[in-house]
Amino acid sequence: YNVGDTKEVDLGSFGTHTVRIANMSECTNGETSETACGFVVEFADIITKQEFNSTPTNVGGWRDSELRTYVNGTIYNSLPSDLQNVITTTKVISGHGKTSGETNFETQDKLYLLSGHEVYEDGTRYQISGYDTSYSNTKQLDYYKNQGVTADSYAETIKQDDYWWLRSAGSSTTGSFLMVDSSGGWFNFGARGSASFPFGVSP
């Protein structure tokens, strides 16, 4: 197996989707989140669209979000049983928003969205580390590192020319999570977006 290898997976009512090997390297710089350590698989496409929360808040971050419940319930349960059986529980560290007193969140998840740093390294012009408080707790996944993805250069992050959520709360607001846009760039967006326009889910 190699980083970047893909395979199609039948998710029942969600249809057929593509998973890819996103990482094989171990964490060696004291990363406390296990989300980019060792063998990591991600979806190379968008499974469905969903709001992060039904109200425009990032209080409680990924840990307390409605989307985390959905991903680890509805989406996980749609996976073939042979795939469910090989997915291990992962220690997930996620960034917080501007709410007073909040620190980074720790969860134990079967499935999780990627963080800002797991996709983007800081660029020279733009830095995502200023918006993702968990930046130093994880590292860039091998797939995106091999593609040279930074906050300045990001064409290889595009999934179906659409928007998809990251799990990092936008640190400068109380109502946004980071996202990847249709051109591959990143930005803050209100956690709810709008009722009629949810964004892509790609754990």
Spans of features found by a protein language model:
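Collagenous Gly-X-Y triple-helix signature in extracellular proteins
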Residues: Y1-S202
